[in-house]
Regions:
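Basic, Lys/Arg-enriched alpha-helical interface segments
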Residues: 1-98, 108, 119-161
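Active-site donor-binding loop signature of nucleotide-sugar glycosyltransferases
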Residues: 116
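Active-site beta-strand-loop-beta-strand hairpin of nuclease catalytic cores
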Residues: 102-113
């Protein structure tokens, strides 16, 4: 049985920490694959979609989303996160106006980010199925079974109130 610690130890995932306000403590966990970190660095270095919808930059949008997630703030279902397809061991999407982040919940309040892309690119090229299948394939390759993947598809299954 693979554990989060095993995945971190073998470099399959890394923990993402974001600086929170002085009065905030992390109440959720956020991990990602090295490939996601590479994409995130591109965004943090100023990468932008062809047309931005949000008032904040994509980097600011991601920072705000990650801070909200890690600090335990309530996330708005369908606006800030949603299940890509209602199925066992579902793939989930974290959302901002300009960015989509795909991954899965390894446990309640513990998200693993695998793919990131611009909202318009995903919608224009209908990339949802490809990301969903890519995440399922990755979990198989890493020998991740149902003990490291939340089965539920409702917000209460993956996030504490």
């Amino acid at each position: 049985m693979t554990t989060i610690a095993d995945l971190v130890a073998n470099g399959a995932i890394v923990k993402i920490d974001v600086e929170l306000a002085a009065h905030e403590q992390p109440s959720r966990l956020l991990y990602s694959t090295p490939g996601f970190i590479q994409w995130l660095r591109h965004v943090l270095d100023g990468g932008r979609p062809p047309a931005c919808v949000g008032e904040a930059t994509p980097a600011e949008q991601i920072d705000d989303l990650f801070c909200s997630f890690l600090s335990g703030e309530p996330l708005i279902f369908t606006r800030q996160f949603r299940v890509v397809r209602a199925e066992d061991n579902a793939v989930w999407e974290l959302k901002t106006p300009d960015v989509r982040i795909f991954g899965w919940f390894a446990a309640k309040d513990c998200f693993v980010a695998v793919f990131g892309n611009w909202t318009d690119t995903i919608k224009d090229h209908d990339l949802y199925r490809g990301y969903r299948l890519g995440i399922r394939r990755l979990r198989r390759e890493l020998c991740i079974d149902e003990t490291l993947c939340v089965k539920g598809v409702s917000p209460d299954d993956v996030l504490s109130a």
